[in-house]
Amino acid sequence: QPINNSVITENMFQLINQKGLIPHITAYEYNNGSAMAVRYQFKEKGRDIQQGPNGTKNTFLCPEIWAYNSYDGTQTARLTGAVYDSACENGIAFKNTINFYKLKHTKNNADMAYIVGSELDSYFDRLNQQINLLESWANIEINYMDTVRLLEKIKGVSFLDRTKPAKRQAEKTGDKIHSQIFGEVKKRGQENVNLWSIVSAVTNYSTLREDKGSNIHGLSTNSLNVGVSRQENVASWLSNIVAPFAENRLAGGLV
């Protein structure tokens, strides 16, 4: 039998009460209630970070958990950990936080809260380490060619010279993300493009929203399966491409 949405939400409610947490909750329902995404933001676990070496504004980051059910047509439920950015309401997931807890509909799900609860504190520690990482990325200023090289390595995104018209959807997406980057720079009070601006623009593209046009370039999606797929792709990009690039730069490398 398919996993009932209420079983997941009740288990999460039990878990949250046990931990004495008061998250901000946003719920999305799909297919007449048979599929869902619920976003739990744990703001009491977050903090402000500076958005660049010359940035004039801070932003608030905190751990969050996304609870998905039947997101891929196979009646699979999953909890995904991410970092919530209050400036643009993005959810920033990494490869090592994408599958906090995964459950097929053929398995008993009654113990979800117990299993998750036994690991939740260490999981918050892991997400707070990601917040530290994101803050360090705000100190890495990068040039146009670095931006292009990074964007071209996102699955499903291509990038054209801005003097040429975008033809394919992947190119149009690349152009939208590139335009979003400069909006991020201005909004965050930065002097130049830094790695944080790029990550924020890309995670605009991968964050599920009720109104997909809620940011100026309409990068977001309100489709459950598309949103989860993008989140997976961007999580891999952050972990496999951006993190090594940043580590190299912080160590004094050029590439």
Please place each PLM-identified region on the residue numbering.
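Intrinsically disordered, low-complexity regions enriched in serine/threonine
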Residues: 28, 43-255
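Feature for intrinsically disordered/low-complexity regulatory segments and propeptides
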Residues: 1-11
